[in-house]
C-alpha cells in the first residue's frame, strides 16, 4: 500500500538525465540527478538534497520514520522523506511529486542557486 495517493503524471519517475531538479515554484536547487535512483514507487526517488537547506522537514503524524518535506526557500510541498529506506543502509528515500519539480539539464544551470 502506498503512503501517498497516486494520480499519475509522474514524468520524472524514470527520468535519469544528468542535471538538477529545482523547485517548480521558486527555482531553488533541491536534488541532483546523481542522488536519483530507480525505486518501485511511482514517484521519483532521491537519497539526498543538494544543500542542507534545500528542504524543510516536519514529522508526519502517525507515521514514524516519515517526514513531510517542502522547499526550504518558498515552502512548496514536495513529498516525503522516509528515514533508513534508501538504496543503501542508513540512507533516506526522498519520495517527491514530479509536479513540484522542474528539471534543469546539465550545462544549462543559470547559477548555483536557481531562482535568486
From Swiss-Prot:
EC number in record: 1.8.4.12, 1.8.4.14
Catalytic activity, reaction form: L-methionyl-[protein] + [thioredoxin]-disulfide + H2O = L-methionyl-(R)-S-oxide-[protein] + [thioredoxin]-dithiol; [thioredoxin]-disulfide + L-methionine + H2O = L-methionine (R)-S-oxide + [thioredoxin]-dithiol
Binding site for Zn(2+): 23, 26, 71, 74
Needed cofactors: Zn(2+)
Example of a GO cellular component annotation carried by this entry: nucleus
Function: Methionine-sulfoxide reductase that specifically reduces methionine (R)-sulfoxide back to methionine. While in many cases, methionine oxidation is the result of random oxidation following oxidative stress, methionine oxidation is also a post-translational modification that takes place on specific residue. Acts as a regulator of actin assembly by reducing methionine (R)-sulfoxide mediated by MICALs (MICAL1, MICAL2 or MICAL3) on actin, thereby promoting filament repolymerization. Plays a role in innate immunity by reducing oxidized actin, leading to actin repolymerization in macrophages.
The protein's name in its UniProt record: Methionine-R-sulfoxide reductase B1
Organism: Sus scrofa (Pig)
Amino acid at each position: 500500500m502506498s503512503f501517498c495517493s497516486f494520480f499519475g503524471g509522474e514524468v520524472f519517475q524514470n527520468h535519469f538525465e544528468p542535471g538538477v531538479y529545482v523547485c517548480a515554484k521558486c527555482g531553488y536547487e533541491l536534488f541532483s540527478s546523481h542522488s536519483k535512483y530507480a525505486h518501485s514507487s511511482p514517484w521519483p526517488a532521491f537519497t539526498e538534497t543538494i544543500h542542507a537547506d534545500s528542504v524543510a522537514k516536519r514529522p508526519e503524524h502517525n507515521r514514524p520514520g516519515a517526514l513531510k518535506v517542502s522547499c526550504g526557500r518558498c515552502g512548496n510541498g514536495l513529498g516525503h522523506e522516509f528515514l533508513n529506506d534508501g538504496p543503501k543502509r542508513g540512507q533516506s528515500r526522498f519520495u517527491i511529486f514530479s509536479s513540484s519539480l522542474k528539471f534543469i539539464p546539465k550545462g544549462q544551470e543559470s547559477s548555483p542557486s536557481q531562482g535568486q
